[in-house]
């Protein structure tokens, strides 16, 4: 007799190794999973939410474009709040500072760290949370869609539900560019199990359904999966920055709410892409169904492209992990929710994490993570009698374990 409906998860088509590099973007749930990944891998291997916690699919798309193509932040992204502190419309409240200069410094440092990890990354995890977005009524060059309202007056914003078509359009414009620049990358989508009671439970379910439909469309989209196309078509060499910039601008033309009128943004994106390749399809927007495999080939031939450290068994680069279903369909009990009855509890996050670990970790990384945990437990031990013979033996054995671990995995546990 069974009293639950377990979500059966087969091993993912790729396997993480101790050499893997991972970027995690998204909601609070992404933060929890990202922190656990950071504890299982060498220091500096995982970058978690370099823009802070983000919820909206198009806000995530903008953050990913910034990380991937390294444009400068628009001037009016940074502003002084009514609390006298400086904030960013593109970041969460984690990027708050007493001065504009300090706020910009924090944002730029986090961006550089994320860019360094993404350049070598073999896995990108994106967690979508809601398609309810907040838009500034005032027109700014950085666009009107904000990542966070930063406790500014509600009269400054308009809340809107992003259409399924617009979310798909943004990502179908961006993902082929991401895959062209980072051909070694795998993308893992998840939907946050957090429930938005403020929208009403019915609307919360509708919002999650739209996010699921967006992800499912992108995973099966020819446009978003430019690396798996096999159709032979004529290509044009877009070696001129203005031509490529025009193509990219046209791709995102319908989404000025996200990027605003950032001509410099698209110029920088074009310049960055041209460093990777001299050949791109003439159809970078919605017409990318016919783009050439040469788009990927040219990027792969770049001298600084990193070979994936994933143990991969598949050709597709987009995948889905059912974190939402594990909580809502398998656990489906309020004892697995936090006291607010909306967020998953720590126990639920641990359960979802354990399932992910067994689905995504290679045997080598499983061993590495287990040894790391055990060694850290030993290092955190506070002896009652540090001069005793038992503690001296324990200390010596721990140091020997650390040395063996470092010899095998190439870093010292801390």
Regions found by a protein language model. Give the residues of each.
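Extracellular serine-dependent O-acyl
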Residues: 186-188, 212-225, 315-333, 368-371
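Acidic, His- and aromatic-enriched active-site or binding-groove loops in soluble protein domains
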Residues: 149-159, 205-220, 343-345
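Conserved SGNH/GDSL esterase-like catalytic core that processes O-acyl groups on lipids
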Residues: 32, 43-126, 130-137, 156
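Active-site segments of SGNH/GDSL-like serine hydrolases
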Residues: 5, 131, 176-205, 322-330, ...
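Conserved catalytic region of serine esterases and O-acyltransferases that act on ester linkages
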Residues: 6, 20, 337-341, 350-414
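Cationic, amphipathic, low-complexity segments that mediate targeting or membrane/lipid association
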Residues: 242-277, 281-289
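Serine-esterase "nucleophile elbow" of acetyl-processing enzymes
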Residues: 1-74, 214-217
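A solvent-exposed, charged loop/short amphipathic helix patch at secondary-structure junctions
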Residues: 138-164
């Amino acid at each position: 007799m069974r009293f639950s409906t377990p979500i059966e998860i087969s091993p993912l088509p790729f396997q993480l190794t101790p050499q893997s590099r991972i970027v995690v973007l998204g909601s609070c749930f992404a933060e929890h999973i990202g922190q656990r990944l950071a504890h299982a891998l060498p220091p500096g291997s995982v970058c978690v939410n370099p823009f802070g916690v983000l919820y909206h699919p198009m806000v995530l798309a903008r953050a990913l474009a910034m990380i991937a193509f390294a444009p400068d932040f628009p001037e009016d992204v940074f502003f002084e709040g009514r609390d006298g502190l400086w904030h960013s419309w593109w970041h969460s409240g984690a990027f708050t500072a007493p001065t504009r200069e300090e706020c910009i410094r924090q944002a730029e440092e986090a961006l550089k760290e994320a860019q360094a990890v993404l350049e070598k990354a073999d896995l990108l995890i994106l967690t979508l949370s809601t398609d309810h977005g907040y838009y500034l009524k005032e027109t700014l060059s950085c666009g009107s869609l904000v990542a966070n309202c930063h406790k500014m007056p509600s009269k400054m914003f308009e809340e809107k539900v992003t259409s399924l078509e617009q979310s798909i359009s943004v990502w179908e414009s961006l993902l082929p560019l991401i895959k062209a620049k980072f051909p070694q990358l795998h993308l893992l989508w998840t939907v946050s199990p957090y429930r938005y009671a403020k929208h009403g439970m019915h609307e919360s379910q509708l919002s999650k359904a739209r996010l699921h439909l967006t992800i499912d469309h992108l995973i099966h989209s020819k446009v978003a999966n430019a690396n798996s196309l096999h159709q032979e078509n004529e290509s044009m060499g877009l070696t001129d920055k203005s031509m490529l910039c025009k193509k990219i601008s046209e791709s995102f033309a319908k989404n000025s709410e996200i990027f605003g009128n950032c001509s410099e943004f698209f110029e920088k994106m074009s310049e960055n892409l041209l460093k990777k390749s001299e050949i791109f399809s003439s159809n970078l927007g919605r017409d990318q169904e016919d783009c050439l495999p040469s788009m990927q080939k040219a990027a792969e031939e770049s001298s600084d492209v990193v070979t994936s450290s994933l143990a991969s068994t598949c050709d597709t680069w987009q995948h889905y992990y059912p974190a939402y279903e594990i909580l809502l369909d398998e656990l489906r009990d309020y004892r697995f929710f936090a006291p607010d009855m909306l967020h998953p509890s720590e126990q639920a996050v641990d359960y979802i994490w354990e399932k992910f670990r067994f689905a995504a970790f290679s045997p080598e990384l499983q061993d590495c993570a287990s040894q790391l945990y055990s060694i850290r437990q030993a290092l955190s031990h506070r002896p009652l009698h540090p001069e005793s013979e038992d503690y001296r033996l324990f200390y010596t054995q721990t140091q020997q374990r650390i040395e063996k671990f470092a010899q095998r995995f190439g870093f010292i546990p801390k």
